[in-house]
Amino acid sequence: MLNREEKMKKILGIALGLSVVLTGCSKPEAPAADAAKTDTAAAEQTVTIASTGSDADIWRHIATLPETKAAGLKLDIKNFTDYVAMNTAVANNEVDVNAFQSYAYLVAYNEANTAKIAPLSTTYLEPMGIYSSKVKTLAEFKNGATIAIPNDGANESRALLLLQSAGLVKLKNDFDFVKGTSKDIVENNKALVIKPIQMATAVRVKDEVDAIVLGNTLAMEGGLNVLKDAIYYEPIDQTTKMNINVLAVAEARQNDPVLKKVGELYHVASVGKYVQEHFGGTKIDVNKPVSYLTQAK
């Protein structure tokens, strides 16, 4: 027969066993699916992108893609109208990335500012073109014809290089692709009048001159397709690699793994299809390492 102490031990053992069984059968506090959702939400990282015009449209589209969600990213697109302000915002970490500029423009910004920015990745090249409502070919330009070009730093230099590529002028051998101006023209056989203007006045001025050099964004806003409407446009080769557009970040964040994912998103197939459908082939995809650009300096 069991004594009193042994009976108590047996009762406690049975009680503990029942406790384990009941605990094992109890309902979990949160279903596994809910926990997974919580983990996914926690892992999603918001990246702010400063952009403008057609670039902003592209990034708003990218923000909706399943590839963006799969990368664990949420893109917040901020609209800007001032180019310098977009670079300043990136340099000061007020936004994470900006999307609007060529590599040449980025270099020019860094030369003029203390807080530096850096290319994160390449995106596309938009050829700059020469447009005219008065002539249909380069050969038709008369002596003394006036050609309007952008007056803003790197774009002015780029326009002059385009005129040289077209055979209309010749520039000095050490022409600066960032700071070059019309003063650097050493040969101008047709005595062309090169007129730097503010691009904000381009639409008004277009019919007042014999021709105008436009970047693709302004051309598209005016209903022009550089591949169809320009009488001449930039070749896509080693001579124009500085004109490739880039995503820009603060210099210290150039190798940020989260931001690198943003650069990769631009080159997914569905983005290429969207760009082709909406911009008539005028934004030519360039998926090159950043080193491809820096070697061009």
Residue ranges of predicted features:
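Short helix-initiation/N-cap motifs at beta->coil->alpha
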Residues: 77-88, 176-204
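Bacterial lipoprotein signal-peptidase II cleavage site
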Residues: 24-35
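A bilobed periplasmic-binding-protein/Venus flytrap-type ligand-binding module shared by bacterial periplasmic
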Residues: 127-138, 243-258
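A conserved helix-loop-strand patch within extracytoplasmic ligand-binding domains
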Residues: 120-169, 272
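Short, polar/charged alpha-helical segment
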Residues: 46-76, 85, 89
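Ligand-binding "clamshell"
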Residues: 108-120, 133-135, 208, 213, ...
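Periplasmic-binding protein-like
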Residues: 156-164, 265-287
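Beta->alpha turn/N-cap motifs
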Residues: 54-55, 81-83, 93, 97-107, ...
